């Protein structure tokens, strides 16, 4: 036990000469502990220069002590451990000094940053005040300019010349001695003379009105006399009817047409009756006529489907009995197809005349074996149109009536029973025959009173007059709207192909006065080419790029920047707006996938299209969208920040007034144009 206790050494306590003995606490130490100590307050009292000198001195002392410790360890000796311990304690004290200096330095740095932030906030506040003051100055300057440019209404009055005024005006009005030297009094005198002349003319006007009333009374008396002759004329006309019938007068043509209508098949007859009634009641510009051979129609004394079935049965028997006729199987199928797709000899022709003297010629046919109606369309205008290259499909018979109602493209039969008939003769689809037979649109069937239930296919369908009457007015209005819309697009495309975006006077307020970007190319593209573009994948995947739509490519340029716009034009334009997809080639390729501002430009054209419709019926929507696209490109390029590493002036100087160049973390640019102030802002 004694040996173990002797091995345990008590730790040595080394005190400096000036340090107080451990365990003895003086009164002054107790008072200091009661006070609050703060290094942040001490920073304000200390001199940074002296702290720096203390730092250098402490580092030098540490270097010296480390060297001495190294020297003592290398020499060894009995008293070396005590000296090394002494120097170690001194080094610890110096390290504590360095830590304190480090804390003080961090506190000074934080205070410096806080002071810098406060100063920056003050500068930002002053800068905002300066911008507000500049805006107020600009507003006041505009108001001053308006006041200076103000024109009084008396300036719009066309006064007589000075020579005529002093020659004709009485002296009490002209007052030559006063007005000769005073332009203000001269103007007042001329206005007084103008007022006097207008009073005299007003008196003459009242006299003329009284004379007019007298003449109108005389006219009424004569009209009453003439109206008394009407009953006599009617009786004379009634008595002359046998003579008119004997002489075959032209009015008998309508009666003949009604006689011909008796030989129409039921769907065409319903169409003829309802269209004639609609023309007499609502649209005097609608003319209805019947074309075709009446004799051939009379020869159809029995249902053609029965004879066709009998023929098919006899052909089947012949094929079973003999093998020599097998090589003519293709010819037989062609004959069967022709018989299957045979049209009725009579057809109904509707001429729908629009306000601009353009006429839509509709010829309705009835396929007897398929029990469906088809239509062929043709548009004629009062003046011959020069067809642009991009407008080739607008008035083509294959597309002019496509999707008059949504989804009604007229490429397949609306009668479900026809598919079983097609299987017998090897017809895959009716799409291959619509150019010759016409398009079997659903609205055509409804105008003929035909309705085909999809759940229970029926071969024989009864026509319904009420179905035709309920769809007649709506369909006629849609047809007129479609023709006017296509003709408007036809004229616009002629300008677009020459790089001119036609903007009517009613729509000038939608755009700034100066638009630098210009349209350089407008061409039509195929549906396959549109789907292969890399920046149109979103539209294709969303199902908005159908094969019934029309597709175009526009190119807008300004300087080195080129903006491509792929346009999807729905057949229902302008009730359904076009869809634009953009790709900007400037400092790289930018689309809506890698540039939020390109997405914002597409939103301005596609989403905010109602601002660009213009006056009803909105045929200027497409050209207004293209003009808006040119304006958006100007804003995009002019608000782009200038690269300081590039020498020379900015390629696109800012000419548009913008309240704020960027907004939000995505730095969206101000694309909304505010009329009549003329500045751009964010939405």
Swiss-Prot record:
Transport listed as a keyword = yes
Modification sites for Phosphotyrosine: 225
Q: Where, by residue number, is the motif Nuclear localization signal? A: 7-10
Q: Where is the composition biased (Acidic residues)?
A: 306-319
Listed under GO cellular component are: cytoplasm; THO complex part of transcription export complex
Q: Which residues carry this modification: Phosphoserine?
A: 5-6, 307, 312, 314
Which GO BP annotation is one of this protein's?
A: monocyte differentiation
The UniProt annotation puts the region (Disordered) at: 1-42, 302-330
Chain segments carrying region Interaction with CSF1R: 2-144
What keyword terms does UniProt attach to this protein?
Acetylation, Coiled coil, Cytoplasm, Differentiation, Isopeptide bond, mRNA processing, mRNA splicing, mRNA transport, Nucleus, Phosphoprotein, RNA-binding, Transport, Ubl conjugation
According to the UniProt entry, which residues carry Phosphothreonine?
Answer: 328
Subunit relationships: Component of the THO subcomplex, which is composed of THOC1, THOC2, THOC3, THOC5, THOC6 and THOC7. The THO subcomplex interacts with DDX39B to form the THO-DDX39B complex which multimerizes into a 28-subunit tetrameric assembly. Component of the transcription/export (TREX) complex at least composed of ALYREF/THOC4, DDX39B, SARNP/CIP29, CHTOP and the THO subcomplex; in the complex interacts with THOC1, THOC2, THOC5, THOC6 and THOC7; forms a coiled-coil dimer with THOC7; together with THOC6 and THOC7, plays a key structural role in the oligomerization of the THO-DDX39B complex.
State the function annotated in the UniProt record.
Answer: Component of the THO subcomplex of the TREX complex which is thought to couple mRNA transcription, processing and nuclear export, and which specifically associates with spliced mRNA and not with unspliced pre-mRNA. Plays a key structural role in the oligomerization of the THO-DDX39B complex.
* Record protein name field: THO complex subunit 5 homolog
- Species lineage, top-down? Eukaryota, Metazoa, Chordata, Craniata, Vertebrata
| Gene name linked to the record | THOC5
